[in-house]
Structures are given as C-alpha cells and as structure tokens.
C-alpha cells in the first residue's frame, strides 16, 4: 500500500507492475510492487516493495516482514526487529513527556530524529513554558515552510545552511543535538555553565562550535556521554533520545 500520493522531499511513491486489479467505486488495489520516483519520473533505488509509506519524516519500505529505511538516493538500511519498541531505559521519561504534552508519536523511536521533528519537539517545549509565544514568522528557508522550523529559527534554536536551505529531513548528530538543546535551554531563560574539567575521551572529535554545548548539557544532566567516557559526537541521535532530553530540559526549567 501507499500512504502518500504526492512528492515529499523530492520523491513520490508509485505502484508498478500490476497484473491484477480489484476495482470499486472508491478506487482500485493492484498486486504490483512499489518504489520511489523523482520529479523527472525516474525510479530512485529499488521498486520491489510490498508497501511504502512516509513515516517519522522518512520513507519506509516493506518486503515481506522486513522493513527498510530509504535514504532518497537509492540506498536503504534494514531496520532492526526492535525498531518500533521503546528502549527500557527511556520508558519512564518518555511517559513523563507524554503526560506533559511535550512529546511526538513516533512509530520507530529508535531511528535517528530529523531536523524538522527536533524543531517540532523544541517548539512544543517552548510553547509549554511560554504559552503566550508569538506566532511563527514567515518562512526563512528555501526548502521548508514548516511553522515549527520557522519559529525555532526565529528563536535562534536552529540555523540553516549557507545556501539558504534547512534540509528538514536530514538526521542530526549528537553534537548537533547538544548545540540545539543548549540554545533551547537558553531561550527558555536559563544558561548552563560549560564545565569541562573532566573532558570526554574523544573531546578532540568535538566540533569547536559544539564543545561548550556538549559540556553544558552534561553539567545540568540533560544529555550525557556514552560508554568509556566517550561522547561520540558524530553518532546519530534517536527519536526517543530526543524526547527524553526535551523532557529533561522541561524538568530543569519548570
């Protein structure tokens, strides 16, 4: 099945190769497979999926019982069997975020969060703490008019790229998340000190633009490192990790 019938992120899912159609007054269902085409009408990647959907701000394909995340360039990554399950360590804080209405519903919480969805979370928290916040300004990016993105950019929580784009469906890294969380925390009226008297073992891999934010978020307990005293700045940041850290930010400022 297809859940979208228009171009999203420059791509559109279509059905191909049907040999049998079951018609009705409401439409028809074929027995073909599905794939993505670009705006020139060319297939991008394989087109042998049993189902194809736009889920969690990305295309997810299904072959048999296996699910795949499509990168929009022809590549695909098979999702782990537990992709739709919340991690045990995150359950309590995820539930708290839902209770505080600062969460989003993700089908696959273990997948990396996109820039647009991080903005949606950040704005949810901002509007929770600042209920009289002004409306989103006019779109500031050539490729994105999402209201949460526009407001997050106007507040200084996120920035775009030199070419005027925002790249909303690009995933964020851990150090990018730290920088955005730090700016969000400041926007909410607080400022964390960037104590780094105990640097991470991979401190040299931190971007200069992110270093103070990484340690500031550690200092107030919003975002911690990983095993062996490493931060792993270029690793992806999952959707459930994003919700958990936004919940921690809420606890820190409420």
What annotation goes with each model-predicted range?
Residues 1-81:
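Residue-level detector of conserved, function-critical positions
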Residues 9, 33-34, 56, 67, ...:
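Disulfide-stabilized extracellular ectodomain repeats and their linkers
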Residues 15, 175-176, 241:
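Glutamine-centric residue-chemistry signal
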Residues 73-91, 95-148, 155-175, 181-211, ...:
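Feature responds to low-complexity, polar/acidic, surface-exposed segments characteristic
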Residues 7, 13-16, 61-62, 81, ...:
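Conserved "repeat-terminator" motif of extracellular CCP/Sushi domains
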Residues 238-245:
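C-terminal/domain-terminus segments
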Residues 39, 219-221:
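Tandem repeat domain/solenoid detector
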